[in-house]
């Protein structure tokens, strides 16, 4: 092949003409000190709060403290190779994580990188972890239910799509169990779930993943794992990363449910980072902005209107509202709900489910305290039939707890009080429910109907659970049409009432338990 010198010179001239020698304006700084994952940098003049900083070895950090002559940053990930004198660069970007359908069924870390050994995640979409929550005009009121499948919650403290409902209690009271049951019950409803595990043992997270897989719920769930062995910075950003993944679905007119398990450990991680950054400590040694830490996270859980979704998707999705429902978990110490972080989160959320150690140890599981648990906005979202039938249950339980305490001292009780006590005993038994056994709306309605209409009055309190099991088996085998009808509409009228009464009369006449 003959090379023509003129062709070569022409090619070189063309390349020189098209070469762009624009200088890249990137501020560089120097690592002054490094300890406990906190880096002090000198020379980064125009760095922004929350900006990503690039270190050698493809490692990134987050600028948190902007001081007069230095910048305090936390390193995200391993920092053993970083040393004093190393160069650090501004990136001009804030931290973003991968989002999208590709993450469903996967376990990722706080940066959205796969940690489940199933290979890289195939998504090109990213979203910043910090976002401003939708404003008042962009929101819509909460009026659609999130069914957890737990009688005690759906009847007494209903949760609506776009609500923030706190699950609070001491350690080992079944907080995670309630959250996992809620995820399992979303199977087939189209609600996408995100489970954010902060500061937990890797074995506990693996157990949750296994349980979700066994019940076919992993395929609609993203698990964000920031284990106890990871740095405080990774634990601190995990809930924000999970929230960004949930917002992807909300902003596209879908419904998502996010569980933060738990925000106490996130507050501990943030306290650790703040103290290492030499920020002044306040109450319980937390920094001054620990309320803002949780409020800016939980305000992002909302129900957005159809105009917002249409605008966000550039008209691709029309007439659909989106929602992100949050179930934050807070762990209390010896039932003290008046500590700093619990009171903060109670004031931010739209209600709380209070789990009690004494009830849990007495075998009442889920161990929900009916008197202290409340849902401030869920009532408007509750299914009609459950709202109608469940109204008396909460009252019966609250009265029963009061009377039970009083009756220990009184020997002769009048007939009315004795009846209330007997009914309360049976309703308490009825509210018991095993883990991984969520109930449909119709099944729940039958249980509540049986309690309200006196079908349990002649059943021994110890046999109530057996009665319910036998009743549900009978309904599932011979009354499938009625169950389907109730599940489809959720209405409560004379026709439905007559059908339920006839079904229960038939069951009591022909079956034993």
From Swiss-Prot:
Catalytic activity: ATP + H2O + 4 H(+)(in) = ADP + phosphate + 5 H(+)(out)
Pfam families cross-referenced by the UniProt entry: ATP-synt_ab, ATP-synt_ab_C, ATP-synt_ab_N
Keywords: ATP synthesis, ATP-binding, Cell inner membrane, Cell membrane, CF(1), Hydrogen ion transport, Ion transport, Membrane, Nucleotide-binding, Translocase, Transport
Main location (coarse class): membrane
Protein localization: Cell inner membrane
Subunit relationships: F-type ATPases have 2 components, CF(1) - the catalytic core - and CF(0) - the membrane proton channel. CF(1) has five subunits: alpha(3), beta(3), gamma(1), delta(1), epsilon(1). CF(0) has three main subunits: a(1), b(2) and c(9-12). The alpha and beta chains form an alternating ring which encloses part of the gamma chain. CF(1) is attached to CF(0) by a central stalk formed by the gamma and epsilon chains, while a peripheral stalk is formed by the delta and b chains.
Protein name according to UniProt: ATP synthase subunit alpha
Species assigned in the record: Thioalkalivibrio sulfidiphilus (strain HL-EbGR7)
Name of the coding gene: atpA
């Amino acid at each position: 092949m003959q090379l023509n010198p003129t062709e070569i010179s022409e090619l070189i001239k063309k390349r020189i003409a098209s070469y762009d020698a624009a200088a890249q304006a990137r501020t560089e700084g120097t690592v002054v000190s490094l300890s406990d994952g906190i880096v002090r940098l000198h020379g980064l003049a125009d760095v922004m709060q929350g900006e990503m900083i690039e270190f050698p070895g493809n490692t990134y950090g987050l600028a948190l403290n902007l001081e007069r002559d230095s910048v305090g940053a936390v390193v995200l990930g391993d920092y053993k190779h970083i040393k004093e004198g190393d160069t650090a660069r501004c990136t001009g970007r804030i931290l973003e994580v991968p989002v999208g359908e590709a993450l469903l069924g996967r376990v990722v870390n706080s940066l959205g990188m796969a940690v489940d050994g199933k290979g890289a995640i195939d998504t090109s979409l990213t979203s910043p972890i910090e976002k401003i929550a939708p404003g008042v005009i962009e929101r819509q009121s909460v009026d659609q239910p999130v069914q957890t499948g737990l009688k005690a919650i759906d009847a007494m403290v209903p949760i609506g799509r776009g609500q923030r409902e706190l699950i609070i209690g001491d350690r080992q009271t079944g907080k995670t169990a309630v959250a996992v049951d809620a995820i399992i019950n979303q199977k087939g409803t189209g609600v996408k779930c995100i489970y954010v595990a902060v500061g937990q043992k890797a074995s506990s997270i693996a157990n949750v993943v296994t349980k979700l897989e066994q019940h076919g719920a992993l395929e609609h769930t993203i698990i964000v794992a920031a284990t106890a062995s990871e740095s405080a910075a990774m634990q601190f950003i995990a809930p924000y990363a999970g929230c960004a993944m949930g917002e992807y679905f909300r902003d596209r007119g879908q419904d998502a449910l996010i569980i933060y398990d738990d925000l106490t450990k996130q507050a501990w991680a943030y306290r650790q980072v703040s103290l290492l950054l030499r920020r002044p400590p306040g109450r319980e040694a937390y920094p001054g902005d620990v309320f803002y830490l949780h409020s800016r996270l939980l305000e992002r859980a909302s129900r957005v209107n159809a105009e917002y979704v249409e605008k966000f998707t550039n008209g691709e999705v029309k007439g659909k509202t989106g929602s992100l429902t949050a179930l934050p978990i807070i762990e209390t110490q010896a039932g003290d709900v008046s500590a700093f972080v619990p009171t903060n989160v109670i004031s931010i959320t739209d209600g709380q489910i209070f789990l009690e150690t004494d009830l849990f140890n007495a075998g009442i599981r889920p161990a929900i305290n009916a008197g202290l648990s409340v849902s401030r906005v869920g009532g408007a979202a509750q299914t009609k039939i459950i709202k109608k039938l469940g109204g008396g249950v909460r009252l019966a339980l609250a009265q029963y707890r009061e009377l039970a305490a009083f009756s220990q001292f009184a020997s002769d009780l009048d007939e009315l009080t004795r009846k209330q006590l007997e009914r309360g005993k049976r309703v308490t038994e009825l509210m018991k429910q095993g883990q991984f056994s969520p109930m449909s709306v119709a099944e729940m309605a039958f249980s509540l109907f049986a309690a309200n209409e006196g079908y349990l009055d002649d059943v021994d309190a110890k046999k109530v659970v057996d009665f319910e099991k036998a009743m549900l088996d009978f309904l599932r085998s011979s009354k499938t049409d009625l169950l389907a009808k109730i599940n489809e509409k959720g209405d409560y009228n004379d026709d439905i009432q007559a059908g339920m009464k006839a079904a229960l009369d038939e069951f009591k006449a022909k079956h034993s338990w």
